[in-house]
Amino acid sequence: MSYVLIVFASLLSCGGQLCQKQAAHTRARQRVWGWLALSLVLLGCAMLLWLFVLQTVPVSVAYPMLSLNFIFITLAARFIWHEPIALRHGVGVLLIIVGIILLGGAA
């Protein structure tokens, strides 16, 4: 259950960051504020959920799991904004996945 909460907190955080990226690309002032407001809501929810996670998961396991953000952001950037993923970046993401598996198995 704790790992599900970590993934959900990470997804909320990524959602907030993606809203910030969208706000940076939006030209209409009203839309910018909408994206920024949504970003604050998602990041606030992520923080509250993260505080709960820290009550139930050892810090030495929980914090490295935040590297899920790098994976989610990379995938979202690729599929939403069609940003290329260089070989070096892809290898880095694969290494992060290996690290998460190793840490998850050690917990």
Curated annotation (Swiss-Prot):
Its membrane topology: Multi-pass membrane protein
Predominant localisation class: membrane
Keywords: Cell inner membrane, Cell membrane, Lipid A biosynthesis, Lipid biosynthesis, Lipid metabolism, Lipopolysaccharide biosynthesis, Membrane, Transmembrane, Transmembrane helix, Transport
Highest rank taxon of the organism: Bacteria
Family matches, as PANTHER family: 4-AMINO-4-DEOXY-L-ARABINOSE-PHOSPHOUNDECAPRENOL FLIPPASE SUBUNIT ARNE-RELATED, SMR FAMILY PROTON-DEPENDENT DRUG EFFLUX TRANSPORTER SUGE
NCBIfam families membership: PRK15051.1
Protein name listed in UniProt: Probable 4-amino-4-deoxy-L-arabinose-phosphoundecaprenol flippase subunit ArnE
Species of origin: Enterobacter sp. (strain 638)
Upper classification of the organism: Bacteria, Pseudomonadati, Pseudomonadota, Gammaproteobacteria, Enterobacterales
